[in-house]
Amino acid sequence: MVDSKRMDSGSKDMINDLPDALLCHVLSYLTTKEAASTSLLSRRWRYLLAFVPNLEFDDSAYLHRDKRVKNPLHEKGLVGFVLTVDDKRKKLSTSFPDFVDRILDLQGNSPLDKFSLKMVDDHDPVDPDCVAPWIHKVLVRGVSDLHLVIDMNEWTSLPAKIFLTETLVKLTLKIRDGPPIDVKHVHLPKLKTLHLESVMFDEEDIGFSKLLSGCPELEELVLHHIWSCVWTSCSVSVATLKRLTFCCNNMKFCGMHEENPNNVSFDTPNLVYLEYAEVIANNYPKVNFDSLVEAKIDIWMTNDQLDEVRIRDIYEKNVMVGNATDLIVGIRNVRVLCLSADTLEVLTYCCKQIPIFNNLTHVTIQSTPKVGWKSLLKLLKNSPKLQTLVFQGLLHRDTKEEGVAIIKIEKQIEKVKHFLETMPHLEQLVLHYDSSIDGDMKQLLMLSSLASPKCKVQLIPLVT
């Protein structure tokens, strides 16, 4: 048996010979619970824990499924008990907060890079008497990355100091079921990345604008489920912004009744990447995407608009039930574009004109049997430099006069053939097909013979 401290005579414990700074760096890649367990090794390791620059706390990591056991870290003064899933949450609350308190006390005022806290429970809310002091402590220590995933429920508010911190570079707030946050005063001069999920604002669109105005160096903004669709207007106006993810699709997947947002504006002249998912707005007063390189667009009509389309489309030509023209014109400089099936439908019924995409070289089309390709040909004709065309699925809706949706692989193949014959500059065509539905492989394989010599056709079966 090789001794844990000596591999052979004269050898040394290589790990213990490493400098403290390097060991602290290694510990920073572990969860705080894992890092704390190293304190059992020796007094030196407990000392190192006091200087770990990254702290990550997750209350779900403190649940044991079989029985309530005494945690050996308790003997080191770090934690009380680890409880079973069957134990009451109330008992757990005396263990996990105690662990966080002891770690923060152990570290004192040493510099801190990242503080991550996840406390999510479907039954009991977070105790604000515990969380608020933790946030204050790490902000005083100059934390640069603050990551909070919390079920707030009855928690009155986030500490206002979060939005008045000169050291924060990255801020993530995922607050479920909490009250609106108050952002009357915002001063985040170094903030580069802001990630908000399920966050509501006390003054809705005004509060959101105040928050952005207090972040003069912001480069990346991620918004998920912030309920902007119920605001009077929504404006993302940040001159320094380079990446924007704006996904307010909570009602789409919940099957809730949707209403069109009134006004949505984007004044982001330096933006290079956009991911936008939302029901179409009534108006897009300002769309400034002068530097945009890549865009992923998933916009859709409300159920009321879809019903109107189904009724009028049988008897009328060029039916328009909304206006997303300004948004589509605003992204005309992109090089890489991904459009959802719903967006294709918006182009058909809510876009008076499709602009010329002079820089577009790569297009990805997501297809579904519920949505047609009526606008696709016009889009491709207006993309003179297109080199790569990707179809994710070949099925789409073909509506006849009687309103019956006919789905046949032959119809899709004919349209793809047409794309190949009319796009001489195309260099690559990628087809993601469902082999259980798009069963006629012979027709798919024939596409290669129709393409120009420089166009590569790639067939990729979808994994189910």
Swiss-Prot record:
Coiled coil: none annotated. The keyword Repeat applies. Pfam families: F-box (PF00646), LRR_At5g56370 (PF24758). PROSITE patterns: FBOX. LRR repeats lie at residues 172-198, 200-225, 233-258, 336-367, 368-393, 408-433. It comes from the Eukaryota. This is Putative F-box/LRR-repeat protein At3g59160. Residues 12-60 form the F-box domain. Keywords: Leucine-rich repeat, Repeat. It comes from Arabidopsis thaliana (Mouse-ear cress). PANTHER family: RNI-LIKE SUPERFAMILY PROTEIN. SMART domains: FBD, FBOX. InterPro entries: F-box-like_dom_sf, F-box_AtFBL13-like, F-box_dom, FBD, FBL60-like, LRR_dom_sf, LRR_FXL15/At3g58940/PEG3-like.
